[in-house]
Amino acid sequence: PHKSEVIDGSNVKIKMSPPKFCDKPVNVYGFKGRHVDSGAQHFVVPVDSFSKINALCLAKKIRYSKHFSPKGINVNFFKKIGSNSIQVLTYEKGVERIMLSCGSGSVASAFYASILTEIGSGVIIQVSGGSLSLDFDSDWKNVWLSGAAILLFNSSLLIEDLQ
């Protein structure tokens, strides 16, 4: 179970699972990346640039590749955009779309980015839904993700309506 804290009215932080690599770097359809377990399985690919349209097509192809068969995998693309900031796009299996935000995908991307680049704790992660901040210790055992929590949808269902 995750621990969480309300920072203020709309900002929260959540303790995330420590990330770990599941294999050596692999090349899938010409994209070299790493399989990271950050509480969910992600294939993380560093890129110099990307578009959401290309990311959607490529991620779907990677997600269904035989390398990750039969279960498939979530796919993340990240690029470094500042001295301690990255941009992340996450394609989530099951939903089969690029997500506005994904906590485990952001952690997986920052974990791999910390190996490849000089980002550190306090890294800012730009996702389609806004900005997140990730704090972690040197061995990635104490990992906290912070950002705005926004209600996107609210619904109710009466059981009687189903009969």
Model-derived features: where do they sit?
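Glycine/serine-rich anion-binding loops at beta->alpha junctions
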Residues: 91-111
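A short Gly-Trp-Pro
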Residues: 65-67, 159-163
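Residue-level signal for inorganic ion chemistry
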Residues: 14, 39, 78, 103, ...
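Gly/Ser/Thr-rich beta-alpha loop segments that engage phosphate groups in nucleotides
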Residues: 41, 105-107, 149
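Anionic-ligand binding region
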Residues: 21-36, 43-78
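Acidic, low-complexity central loop/insert segments
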Residues: 1-37, 111-138, 142-143, 151, ...
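Pepsin/retropepsin-fold aspartyl endopeptidases
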Residues: 9, 78, 161-163
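Conserved phosphate-donor
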Residues: 59-91, 96, 131-136
